[in-house]
Amino acid sequence: MTVPSRGETPGPPAQDRLTHIDEAGAARMVDVSGKDVTARTARASGRVLVSPRVVELLRGEGVPKGDALATARIAGIMGAKRTPDLIPLCHPLSVSGVKLDLSVADDAVEILATVKTTDRTGVEMEALTAVSVAALTVIDMVKAVDKGAVITDVRVEEKTGGKSGDWSRS
């Protein structure tokens, strides 16, 4: 812990600080050059609440625009790979794998993304972006039938690897 100079107020402990904000309060990209390259994985999930008619179509003949789940799966994979282009302070990473699982529940399309890398920082944002882009694509694919579809519950479920170790929501 750094001892503050006279007249300065000590800041919060490092684990209580926002890493993307510098001492002056300006946004910055965190320097990860000193971190070890390790295997890292993140899983994120989300749901798109849809009408009973959309559920019926997805389980049967499909929606008018085409294969909604296959299109959303590919969009989610593309989203994970483009995360640093969308999230300003995200590091470009060597994403080594992205898996998207989409399933039709009684009232929603459920989305689960798993992203893997061997790099200096985690892939939580890539997993969240994969879920978000897949969910947006589901909305685009079903909007002709259900203009009231809702994206909800987008969240990280677990992460492994890195200095902070493993974490799981459960």
Swiss-Prot record:
Catalysed reactions, semicolon-separated: (8S)-3',8-cyclo-7,8-dihydroguanosine 5'-triphosphate = cyclic pyranopterin phosphate + diphosphate
Pathways per UniProt: Cofactor biosynthesis; molybdopterin biosynthesis
Keywords (A to Z) from UniProt: Lyase, Molybdenum cofactor biosynthesis
Record gene name: moaC
Keyword Hydrolase in annotation: no
UniProt KW Lyase keyword: yes
A single GO molecular function term of this UniProt record: cyclic pyranopterin monophosphate synthase activity
Disulfide bonds: none
Family: Belongs to the MoaC family.
Oligomeric and partner information: Homohexamer; trimer of dimers.
Enzyme class: lyase
GO terms (BP aspect): Mo-molybdopterin cofactor biosynthetic process
Cited function: Catalyzes the conversion of (8S)-3',8-cyclo-7,8-dihydroguanosine 5'-triphosphate to cyclic pyranopterin monophosphate (cPMP).
Name under which the protein is recorded: Cyclic pyranopterin monophosphate synthase
Amino-acid positions noted as binding substrate in the UniProt annotation, renumbered to this chain: L89, C90, H91, M125, E126
Pfam families: MoaC (PF01967)
Gene3D superfamilies cross-referenced by the UniProt entry: Molybdopterin cofactor biosynthesis C (MoaC) domain
EC numbers: 4.6.1.17
Entry annotation: catalytic residues: D140
Organism listed in the record: Streptomyces avermitilis (strain ATCC 31267 / DSM 46492 / JCM 5070 / NBRC 14893 / NCIMB 12804 / NRRL 8165 / MA-4680)
